[in-house]
A protein has these predicted regions:
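Aromatic-lined carbohydrate-binding/catalytic grooves of carbohydrate-active enzymes
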Residues: 1-97, 105-113, 118-130
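Active-site-proximal substrate-binding groove within the catalytic cores of carbohydrate-active enzymes
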Residues: 69, 87-112, 117-257
Length: 257
């Protein structure tokens, strides 16, 4: 469940609460979770432990990854919260320890989804207050993953970087695409050969909401069939695309359902 947090999808991370009032607030969310469980569906939600916005009520520039020159590390992608900064793993763990138990108390159970944490490289931080090597960042992120497993029953995220695999139950996609290389005769699915049967996954982004040809690739690569509602949310231009393809699903109206 994406966008349930305050101000919706990527609106205020790492701030989560209050539950977005325009969607019914906490009362509406608890009702949704209860209804899903009565229908025998497992329902989990989307949180974030790697990004931070200055509009968040918990914003503190000291929590941001510091570069060698002391400046703050900025993420090139801006979402609905505006300019996004990279959150250092040490304060991220502290915040997760405070917030994720509150999220679990709402009633979510299953493979809790933390955005992008398994599909981005661990970053070094040069802050005087919380210096971290990239290796320490990976170890700290795994602590957050283990916390998710203990609270919700499992952990999932967006990708399948090796450092995350010991704690990863499901990666939404292994890579962004399967693009042919003119220097290669064939593509060998090495990741799947190594981790198949250990981590559930999809081959690449467009095998989520797959077309007929992509669905064959899901089968070939031993993927987990996955369908993502309202995945085409990007205002497209030459540099911004809907990375999960052009297939989409909706359930807002009776006709959609």
């Amino acid at each position: 469940l994406v966008g349930w947090n305050y101000r919706g999808h990527d609106g205020r991370w790492p701030q989560i609460f209050p539950v977005e009032p325009e969607l019914g607030g906490e009362e509406g969310l608890r009702s949704l979770i209860e209804t899903a469980k009565k229908l025998d569906y497992s329902i989990v939600c989307h949180t974030n432990s790697t990004d931070t916005y200055s509009v968040a009520d918990c914003w503190d520039p000291e929590d941001v990854v510091h570069l060698r020159d002391g400046s703050l590390s900025v993420n090139d992608c801006g979402w609905s919260g505006g300019r996004m900064y990279h959150l250092c793993a040490e304060p991220a763990l502290r915040q997760a320890q405070e917030l994720l138990p509150q999220v679990a108390k709402l009633g979510f159970t299953g493979l809790h989804y933390i955005d992008v944490i398994s599909t981005i490289p661990p970053r070094a931080c040069y802050s005087d207050k919380h210096p971290m090597t990239a290796r320490q960042t990976a170890e700290t992120w795994r602590e957050i993953m283990r916390l998710s497993r203990s609270l919700f029953g499992g952990f999932s995220s967006e990708g399948g970087y090796d450092f995350a695999v010991p704690e990863l139950d499901f990666g939404l996609y292994v890579s962004f695409g399967l693009k042919p290389c003119p220097l290669a005769d064939e593509c060998v699915p090495l990741w799947q050969l190594v981790y198949h049967g250990y981590v559930l996954s999809n081959p690449y982004t467009t095998t989520v909401n797959p077309s007929a040809s992509d669905l064959l690739k899901v089968v070939e690569y031993g993927g987990r069939p996955t369908f993502y509602y309202d995945s085409r949310f990007v205002t497209q231009d030459e540099t911004h695309k809907n990375w999960m393809g052009e297939e989409d699903f909706h359930c807002a109206t009776e006709a959609d359902r």
